[in-house]
Amino acid sequence: YIPNVKMSSSESFFDKLKKDVSNYPEYKGELYLEKHQGTYTTQGKVKKNNKECERLLHFAEWICTMAYMQGKEYPHKELEEIWKEVLLYQFHDILPGSSIHRVYEECNARYEILKAKLNCIIDAAVSYLRNDENSYFAVNSIDFERSGYAKHNGEWYKYSLAPYSACKLEKANLPVSLHFSKNVIENEHFKVEFDNKGQIEKILDKHNDYNCVSSSFNAVRIYKDRFVHPYNAWDIDINYTKHKPRNMKLKTSREYIDGNSVIRENEFSYNKSSLKQKIILTQNSPYIKVENEVSWHETHKMLRIDAYPKNFSDKVLCDIQFGNIERSTKTDNKIDYAQFEIPAHKWVDVYDGKYGVAILNDCKYGHRVKDGLISLNCLRSPVYPDKTADRGEHFFTYAIYPHSKKPMESELVKIGYELNNPLRIYKGSLDIKPIFNCDNSNIIIETVFVNDKGNIAVRMYETAGIKTVARVKANINFISVKQTDMLFENAVDVDLDAMTFKPFEIKTLEVKR
């Protein structure tokens, strides 16, 4: 029997459902697909390129808005064309990694062209705004304050940036509270110790006198990833953990200081593959950054980085688009057991009520958080439909963030944004102030751009999952500010001194100047 089908808009579909809502069963929770968990990881290069394009588009929209406010034409046509192509590559077989080889040859080549175009758009806006001086300035494109040290053209500079701002860099006298010895690196926050395999065997949180490592962190492991017919690129065998993994072999290691960071450098190998790794402690930084350069030449293997925190919980908090979700770390029922690999965007966090550890990343999305383990899936090597999938060179960064506060009261969200949005440094001088500020830390101004009407759009969301009343301050002159839907329709008046957000609610402001 084939039911009658009627084409309609999503709005009319849901309006019809509302009339009969009492007749339908109700389910609260995530509709987890018990298939295709490999798509969180397969074809890592296309996933990284997608992330970089999204980041550059975000930066371009904001900086072009700043230039637009000073009289420069906003590049609507160019940005729209790039957005459409980036969204095309988010098609359900391209971005997930389940297309044929030709698709990735073509789209990865196109990504490079798109990134070059976006960098040109950004640089043109910056050039329009800046003054020509014999100095340097940094630009911060996220809704968080940032401070620290940056290296540019061989010189070190100090910066202190408000959200969505730019400021002059000052030449810096580098700090001296960094130390290292054999198998040890240390800053004012942490003392990190390594074993003879290159794994982290101790992370001492100096402020809380607490070692958050149970057995090891940064365990670089190779797991069997057998062909699940016919969905090799799509699926991971649920029983893969029953096969004992192999550790990548540590070949060389050293410790040293570079400017404001103390670094442990590891070189690993396995068969024809190799990994160069830098574990970095930076002055005043509350997290440990791990940069990875992989030459990957395996078949039906997974490269995963495993961590066993001393603190664990029945729940893991996972970053998703415009919010977060709790998932189970248990395996004692069919639903929880089936969720052996879970997706997350910028981080996953396990907090036991007293202490927590987050694993953050800049382009990796597959995680296993079960039985005391946090495992980041870094690379796969399927043979169908692309027999060369993921073979080659890869660069990615992950981070370890130990914390004693609750996740949403800690710096977790900020660090996720910092890791995924590096500073840009330019010659000259430029002083940009944020056009809007919010007095509540769990309201994030996510996007600033110019809409098709020529008005400034400010999109923000609630990130902690709680009802919030916030004051939003405008730092520019305006004729009117309206709250609208995402299509800039159904405009209503808004009280900027008392904006009410539902948990994870997205709000859009339209500013007419």
Feature roles, as predicted:
Residues S9, V86, Y398:
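Conserved, mostly hydrophobic/aromatic
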Residues G44-A60, Y111-V126, I200, I279, ...:
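Short, Φ-rich (hydrophobic/aromatic) sequence segments
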Residues N4-K6, S127-R513:
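C-terminal (or distal) subdomains of carbohydrate-active enzymes
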Residues Y24-K84:
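Structured, charged N-terminal subsegments at the starts of enzyme catalytic cores
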Residues Y1-Y40, K433-N442, N451:
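C-terminal domain-boundary segment and adjacent tail
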Residues Y1-Y27, E52, C64, Y68-E78, ...:
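Catalytic-core region of carbohydrate-active enzymes that cleave or remodel glycosidic bonds
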Residues L57-P163, T447-V448, K453:
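Histidine-centered catalytic/metal-binding microenvironments
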Residues G44, K48-K51, Y74, S99, ...:
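Conserved aromatic-histidine-acidic binding/catalytic patches
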